[in-house]
């Protein structure tokens, strides 16, 4: 296999106008890979460390230190290694960093190189990235979980829940699912305008109308689904990313004007699941409330997907504990939460072996990089969360999945309703 000849990084901008790292890897056979690193707005305290420069430049958010770490230490360490040994390369960078959370070199530096190496190796092998990573069994196209109303830390809409998503579970193909989702998105704009609300957009391309409650937002989406000619629960299901750690303060959940315990929040979710065709609830409780997650999973986990995002942070060790405690039943997969592809692979594999579902995910700060689209297929996630069908940083991932579907031809299978085995709607 071709060896790594040169590793290089630069500072670029993400979709929110903040700096991020872009890494390039060149192999001795002329092959090449480039990758841009995403960044989150609502971040879990257990995530790998994103290295920022501080100071006045870019309001302290520059990444020149991370870029320097790639161009000097990481590049020197990886020169001469075979590019197809992803685990060896990732472990070399982890060892070089020497910290538990990649804080010395920066997870943003390490991840950029990790992804660029995989792309260069795929280029050298003459394979698309999803096939290079996933092998011949990589053939399942994921359900697009489209965030069409943005709230919480992603918008100024006033609603506490961070994301209201649609899942086109009734489609036969990914391309049909994408069309269905886009049609609902446009119908929602019409519904919002008819009610005299703002059609401004949040970080992830979803609308950010000023609504008073979770139910009001869900009602808007149900109306849009029907306006577009689809049946809620049959053609299009609903999903939530609550991001509850964002409104957890002093031991209570400050939700919709009241203060609630974990048990009271569980009742809120149970009522929502009974009232709406909800297939998935992400981060319903604070990120260290293990007991609360276990109780919630026992209460409603048989009929809805309970996803750990800030709760698991794509970390195999936290996931292992969650499996042992029967806390949640699904993992959100964000490559920059853990910082290398290898550790991401390990987390997804562990989840699937335990009967957990997995959802590949973007971050609110994205680039035109499409790696996660390939990873969703390569790792057989069955679900992908990458924003509304709007804004090129989000649509780039959907368009890549259209290309993958075309490449797969008759071998491609759309996950559809099967991605949500617990949903009884």
From Swiss-Prot:
Which SUPFAM superfamilies does the record match to this protein?
Enolase C-terminal domain-like, Enolase N-terminal domain-like
Can you name the source organism? Corynebacterium glutamicum (strain ATCC 13032 / DSM 20300 / JCM 1318 / BCRC 11384 / CCUG 27702 / LMG 3730 / NBRC 12168 / NCIMB 10025 / NRRL B-2784 / 534)
Q: Where does Mg(2+) bind?
A: 241, 282, 309
Q: Name one Pfam family in it.
A: Enolase_N
EC nos? 4.2.1.11
Q: Which pathway? A: Carbohydrate degradation; glycolysis; pyruvate from D-glyceraldehyde 3-phosphate: step 4/5
Recorded hits in PANTHER family, A to Z, give:
ENOLASE
Q: Which family does it belong to?
A: Belongs to the enolase family.
An example GO BP is: glycolytic process
* Locations listed in the record: Cytoplasm; Secreted; Cell surface
Gene3D superfamilies given in the database record: Enolase-like C-terminal domain (3.20.20.120), Enolase-like, N-terminal domain (3.30.390.10)
The record's GO CC annotations read:
cell surface; extracellular region; phosphopyruvate hydratase complex
> Any idea which residues are catalytic in this one?
204 (proton donor), 334 (proton acceptor)
> What CDD domains does the annotation carry?
enolase
The record's InterPro entries line, in alphabetical order, gives: Enolase, Enolase-like_C_sf, Enolase-like_N, Enolase_C, Enolase_CS, Enolase_N
According to the record, how does the cofactor bind? Answer: Binds a second Mg(2+) ion via substrate during catalysis.
Q: Which cofactor does it need?
A: Mg(2+)
The main place the protein resides is: cytoplasm
Quick one: which residues bind (2R)-2-phosphoglycerate? Answer: 162, 334, 363-364, 385
Q: Which EC class is this protein assigned?
A: lyase
Role: Catalyzes the reversible conversion of 2-phosphoglycerate (2-PG) into phosphoenolpyruvate (PEP). It is essential for the degradation of carbohydrates via glycolysis.
Quote the protein name from its UniProt record.
Enolase
Q: Which UniProt keywords apply?
A: Cytoplasm, Glycolysis, Lyase, Magnesium, Metal-binding, Secreted
Instruction: Give the gene name.
Output: eno
């Amino acid at each position: 296999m071709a060896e790594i000849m040169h590793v290089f990084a630069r500072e670029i901008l993400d979709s929110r106008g903040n700096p991020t790292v872009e890494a390039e890897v060149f192999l001795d056979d002329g092959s090449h890979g480039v990758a841009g690193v995403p960044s989150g707005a609502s971040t879990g305290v257990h995530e790998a460390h994103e290295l920022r420069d501080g100071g006045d430049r870019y309001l302290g958010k520059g990444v020149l230190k991370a870029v320097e770490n790639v161009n000097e230490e990481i590049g020197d360490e990886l020169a001469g290694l075979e590019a197809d040994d992803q685990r060896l390369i990732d472990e070399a960078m982890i060892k070089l960093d020497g910290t538990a959370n990649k804080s010395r070199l920066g997870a943003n530096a390490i991840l950029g190189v990790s992804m660029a190496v995989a792309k260069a190796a795929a280029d050298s092998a003459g394979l698309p990235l999803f096939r290079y990573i996933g092998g011949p069994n990589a053939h399942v196209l994921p359900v697009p979980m489209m965030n069409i109303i943005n709230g919480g830390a992603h918008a100024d809409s006033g609603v506490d829940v961070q994301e209201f998503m649609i899942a086109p579970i009734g489609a036969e193909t990914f391309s049909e699912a994408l069309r269905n989702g886009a049609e609902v998105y446009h119908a929602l704009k019409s519904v919002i305008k008819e009610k005299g609300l703002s059609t401004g957009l949040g970080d992830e391309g979803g609308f950010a109308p000023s609504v008073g409650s979770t139910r009001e937002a869900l009602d808007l989406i149900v109306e849009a689904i029907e306006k577009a000619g689809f049946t809620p629960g049959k053609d299009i299901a609903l999903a939530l990313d609550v991001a509850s750690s964002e409104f957890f303060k002093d031991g209570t959940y400050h939700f919709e004007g009241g203060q609630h315990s974990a048990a009271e929040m569980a009742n809120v979710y149970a009522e929502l699941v009974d009232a709406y065709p909800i297939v998935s609830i992400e981060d319903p409780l604070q990120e260290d409330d293990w007991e609360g997650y276990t109780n919630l999973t026992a209460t409603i986990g048989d009929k809805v997907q309970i996803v750990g995002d800030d709760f698991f942070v794509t970390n195999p060790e936290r996931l292992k504990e969650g499996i042992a405690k029967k806390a949640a039943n699904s993992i959100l997969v964000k490559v920059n939460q853990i910082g290398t592809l290898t550790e991401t692979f390990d987390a997804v594999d562990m989840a699937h072996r335990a009967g957990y579902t997995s959802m590949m995910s973007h971050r609110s700060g994205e680039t035109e990089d499409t790696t996660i689209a390939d990873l969703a297929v390569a790792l057989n996630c069955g679900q992908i969360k990458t924003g509304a069908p709007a804004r090129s940083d989000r649509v780039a991932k959907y368009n890549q999945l259209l290309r993958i579907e075309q490449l797969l031809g008759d071998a491609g299978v759309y996950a559809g309703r099967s991605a949500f085995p617990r949903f009884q709607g």
